């Protein structure tokens, strides 16, 4: 067996501060290419057990050879912006698109935006009198989408595998259907929404989180019997 993977990631960042405003922006892209191949040959009934190590042809009961070749490509582009005002109001926005060779051309790319915001309530002026009790208090919320392409290659087209069938005293090579193709396959998408409250009491001797979230997945990628 042989496997080769090539990965290239490039990012460009910009950060600046003006007064109580802080901004950080990042742009990037990533390329991933994977290739694997395998070859299998076997034989049995050698005159001596050691012969098969050096020469498979010395056996008298050869097995059917097997070989495979597989390659996948993934390209991603992403952008992220983070804004912070006075360490009280925080905002993050992200947009990424991913393209996978595992899907047909018309469904190759998926778009996955996300955003999150947070308010450090404990930094507000009206919380000063309570600081001895409430050390930290932050309200946060987020919404976003993420993609999944964890399926085998070429599932959008029908796959055949080699086989042999008996014809009298001989075997004839043939092809049989392994899976039925689905050209409508596309990125599985999980939509996540979250709201939470983080708190710390008595100089953070006591801390905790109250959180509510909801995840919903659509366009599930799975194998079903027909």
Language model features: what each stretch is:
Residues 1-226:
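Extracellular/periplasmic, surface-exposed regions of secreted and cell-surface proteins
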